[in-house]
């Protein structure tokens, strides 16, 4: 019998936006001390959120939960102008860890709205990123999730249309919705550059290319992570066994066979530590070997929020 083989996908795990957001929260806690309030989860990963709670971060869903004058960090998913104004009204010391690729979508929404366009936003209702983007121009944005939503759209003749997308969508799903939009509204404007982020695309590409050789696919990530859910869906497309788990604590020995070929990847908000602990669990239980498959190299970094850059430099110099 051939022993278990782990196919370790690369790239996987943290993207540049998540790295920046996590570094920002770490530095904010060091600079100001706890408690540091974070509007929504810093990233959609339960392990990361638990770790920061233990360090003194407090995750809130409304600005009213933050004491006046408190320190507040906006998460990687971005916020609406209304939230920024509410933070100012409470005299909060607000820092912004919004991913620059999300900010790009916000700026596109503002630009199109000012030019008189109706914006069709492709995304998941209720997702933090979607709420922030829609808040930039609520009177001008219509949300769609799939082709059926597109088929229900009706606009006055002569309406100028543009579309934008949530950054963490399935490339294939978004492509189908965009094709339907173009069929129904041939004059619709598209963003100058694809809104789906590089890391989302790269991780999906790796799963597509590597799933053929796998019997089972394990995606490390949390259930509320949009990009992790899309990876699981992609993994399961051809009838393969696919699971989305936070770590080895969610796995059972009877889910695997001794000779399985197990593809492991991780969503953009899942830390490498949970990948390694999952590999260790499979090695311990199945004597598995690891074969890393690099599909694409990544070397992207995003700058910290300006108020943290000098402090970060001081901390680095002191080491």
Curated annotation (Swiss-Prot):
Residues the entry annotates as binding (2E)-4-hydroxy-3-methylbut-2-enyl diphosphate: 44, 77, 127, 167, 225-227, 269
Name of the top EC class for this enzyme: oxidoreductase
Superkingdom of origin organism: Bacteria
Biological processes per GO annotation: dimethylallyl diphosphate biosynthetic process; isopentenyl diphosphate biosynthetic process, methylerythritol 4-phosphate pathway; terpenoid biosynthetic process
Lineage per the UniProt record: Bacteria, Pseudomonadati, Planctomycetota, Planctomycetia, Pirellulales
Listed GO MF terms: 4 iron, 4 sulfur cluster binding; 4-hydroxy-3-methylbut-2-enyl diphosphate reductase activity; metal ion binding
Entry function: Catalyzes the conversion of 1-hydroxy-2-methyl-2-(E)-butenyl 4-diphosphate (HMBPP) into a mixture of isopentenyl diphosphate (IPP) and dimethylallyl diphosphate (DMAPP). Acts in the terminal step of the DOXP/MEP pathway for isoprenoid precursor biosynthesis.
Organism expressing this protein natively: Rhodopirellula baltica (strain DSM 10527 / NCIMB 13988 / SH1)
Sites where the protein binds isopentenyl diphosphate: 44, 77, 127, 225-227, 269
Coiled-coil region(s): none
Residues where [4Fe-4S] cluster binds: 15, 99, 197
Catalytic residues of the enzyme: 129
Pfam family, one: LYTB
Cofactor: [4Fe-4S] cluster
Keyword field contains Kinase: no
Keyword Secreted applies: no
Record protein name field: 4-hydroxy-3-methylbut-2-enyl diphosphate reductase
Stated family: Belongs to the IspH family.
Enzyme Commission no: 1.17.7.4
Binding-site residues, dimethylallyl diphosphate: 44, 77, 127, 225-227, 269
Signal peptide: none
Co-factor binding comment: Binds 1 [4Fe-4S] cluster per subunit.
């Amino acid at each position: 019998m051939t022993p278990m083989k782990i196919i370790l996908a690369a790239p996987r795990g943290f993207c540049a936006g998540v790295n920046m957001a996590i570094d920002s929260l770490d530095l904010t806690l060091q600079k100001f001390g706890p408690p540091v309030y974070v509007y929504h989860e810093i990233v959609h990963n339960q392990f990361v959120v638990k770790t920061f709670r233990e360090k003194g971060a407090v995750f809130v869903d409304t600005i009213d939960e933050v004491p006046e004058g408190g320190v507040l960090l906006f998460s990687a998913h971005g916020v609406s102008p209304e939230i920024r104004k509410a933070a100012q009204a409470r005299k909060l010391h607000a820092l912004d860890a919004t991913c620059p690729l999300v900010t790009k979508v916000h700026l596109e929404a503002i630009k199109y709205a000012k030019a008189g366009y109706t914006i069709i936003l492709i995304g998941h209702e209720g997702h933090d990123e979607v709420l922030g983007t829609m808040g930039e121009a609520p009177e001008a944005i219509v949300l769609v999730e799939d082709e059926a939503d597109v088929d229900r759209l009706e606009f006055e003749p002569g309406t100028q249309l543009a579309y934008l997308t949530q950054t963490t969508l399935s490339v294939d799903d978004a492509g189908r919705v965009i094709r339907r939009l173009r069929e129904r509204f041939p004059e619709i404007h598209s963003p100058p550059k694809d809104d789906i982020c590089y890391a989302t695309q790269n991780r999906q590409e790796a799963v597509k290319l590597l799933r053929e050789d796998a019997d089972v696919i394990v995606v490390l990530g949390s259930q509320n992570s949009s990009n992790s859910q899309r990876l699981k869906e992609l993994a399961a497309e051809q009838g393969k066994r696919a699971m989305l788990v936070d770590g080895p604590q969610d796995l059972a020995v009877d889910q695997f066979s001794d000779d399985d070929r197990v593809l492991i990847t991780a969503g953009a908000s899942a830390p490498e530590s949970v990948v390694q602990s999952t590999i260790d669990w499979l090695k311990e239980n199945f004597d598995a070997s690891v074969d890393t498959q690099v599909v694409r190299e990544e070397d992207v970094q995003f700058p910290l929020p300006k108020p943290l850059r000098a402090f970060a430099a001081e901390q680095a110099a002191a080491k």
